[in-house]
């Protein structure tokens, strides 16, 4: 079996859940499977993460930390790397160039699933940085929140990272989802932290696609082949 290297810590709870999802998926194939997994927890400060998520600032410092993690995973024996953070994929090309092993792309894996499902209008729930850098705009017809709601999503994601006001944030996020879902035939949780608030598979009759689950599925498949 191959070894996967996870660039984690963005945020820690999401990384832990992603890790367990990979194990669960591998054990569905074979109950005795215990996949080989390395995790490099990115030592990023909340201040730097918030600055990048909200304002796309601090790119140089953020990229340096991600590249260090990628190189450490390669040195540790990883056969390929995954990053369970959509926003970090702003740097996917630089990360790929920094190592000599494959790096799975959460954006590409998600696009494959959405195209297979023939989703025509996809409601996008993501960080301001993901929206600003148009990570999902290629080949997907997106329905984006209005400016105010997008700012609220940024605040909600920061609160998730700080473990603050969880119940209140869920209610606020559901209101935003209700607005977006009226124009969508699919909803995309394009921030891996959002699944901590929205575990549902459908909301208002609209199917919810979780990018973290999609990447976990692609990771397990690669581990087992």
Task: Name each model-derived stretch.
Residues 1-225:
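Non-catalytic structural scaffold of enzyme domains
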